[in-house]
């Protein structure tokens, strides 16, 4: 027999998953790993790291993945390590004590809808500021014991991981998440099977798995369509954050809004207030309207109930930033809903239009949110004003400054963003109840009692940690992107821990103003190469994959950073995420922000830096317009000198250079014998004492309750009392007023001759009398005089609104009188308007019928 030289069959491989078998004495580690609580409790994070520091780094600081990969011998050794067990048990006791506290039932309950949540870098379901804010919000809701739940998506690929080519080109890498190794859990049905939510899309259903993230005491429910029950196209609905075309975006928003409400029903969850964090979630009110109509209400009655319990928070300052959908596309998926709500297709479209009845106007989610939510708010004082202007077309008859759009300035979750070194310092010198009273300025003023030297040592320690982190984490990246390793070594050597370190990190959109620093490269080169005042800049940030201008800006900065005069002085760090952000906001000396005014709705990165003794240098826009105090940071004025943006940029750049050269650098380097600048430490103390207490997430959450949640919940419960008796009355009253509105007549209107001629004297009062035929309505009309003036830019503003008093009634005739005058001389315009009035209305824009008259 001839022996073959090679004789083997093909192996039959079977994939098996081997998970760590956790000893009983370490079971509490699994419980804590599955709750995001560890992400803002440093001792818990450190506990997981100590289990296996090398593996902790290898798994990207993910405790779930860490426990899965710990080998059995390591686990057995830990299970008998008395010192480690003592530490684990102490932290677990604190965790269980925290979790045992029940929600405060004296405060309204809230359902919170958002497209993204930034909870930890481990869970890639966020892209930027909106998500970070939402994540911070849920964490603070947990810390503040609020009855809240979140609704969002579990993205298979999340937002992209950024890498940069040798020439600075951004490369977007989408890496699939392994859900089994993330800090979340499947929601099961009554048969202990994975829960499936069926969401109607006109002629078919999309099927979503449901996951739960435990954010301390707050549950966050995430929908996931990437399963075999769906078509290939529908599986991709939850593949990428803001991914795909406009059709996919609409599918996402249907799933978030309509699917989110269906999920709450399936889970048996009912809340007092439904909070749409951005317009992406606005369609939640479509499903809520359907539910109330199908329970027996008319559409108008259902709208009263839904509106009374809904809040819309807008985050964009420009109309182009809102989502608009063509009628054909919108009808493809939403065509069946009008019938369920008892209205026409035109009625539904008009709820999303500024100009109802205009067939050329697309459906806008933000307009729909404004029309179906009682309250609307921006995210800073200035953004509130910008939003009043932006949405003014929805409420015709009122000037922008009159409408009900309010604001709550964004804050940051202190335990998440404050470095452990600063927490230790605050705990040492502040009140023991500091964490429960973060918004109390008196407590923060105790920073003035902290020795200067201790603050300086804290700052130096964190700066060195950042520099070491950069050297460790980014050496491989730089080697990959540079042909010459010696150049990388040279770059590393040029990073100077004693230099003033300025950070600029955010989403790279052109309006964020990263280009300003590079307006005059010769002047910038002189600044960064001054041997007496060394300074270095750290940049980080991602540009949207479809934003060519933003990507071009990144490329330009990297090209400049590779020039000999800027090598090691300007550094761009790739893949900006929460992990890198925490290092930057605690490690740099100055946090710079230079957005185009007034396009920064709020901005919170500077607030995070503030908590870590980092001084802000920013345009007076967003939160810094409110936060800036002289001696507590530096600012560029909020006022534009030029309408031409290029000229304004040149002026702003020159101002930045000048402030750096004449104020910031001399102050930083005015060192005493102990090696630090007393003036610099004073600036740090001022910023912490005078600014920090006003920008915590605790303050933000309390503001939402004080300004919106409380009054909405109170009104909602009043409306639903006695089988919705008030709802029925109010809807009937509105219907009657609407039916008779065009018939109401101004029978007579008597003004003095001076007013008729348009010539009046300041300080002199005039009497006006107006008789109105209300056509059978019962004192349902208000009359007022509106006085306006025009400023130097040609913008018309309200000078005064003077109500006329109803003094007599004869049948349907109501007589109104007013005695008023103008105290200031000048040129004004005067007109009169009537409007429906009812104490049951939350504000005028809730029933926006207005008729102007002057004769």
Regions found by a protein language model. Give the residues of each.
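Catalytic cores of carbohydrate-active enzymes across secretory and cytosolic contexts
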Residues: 1-855
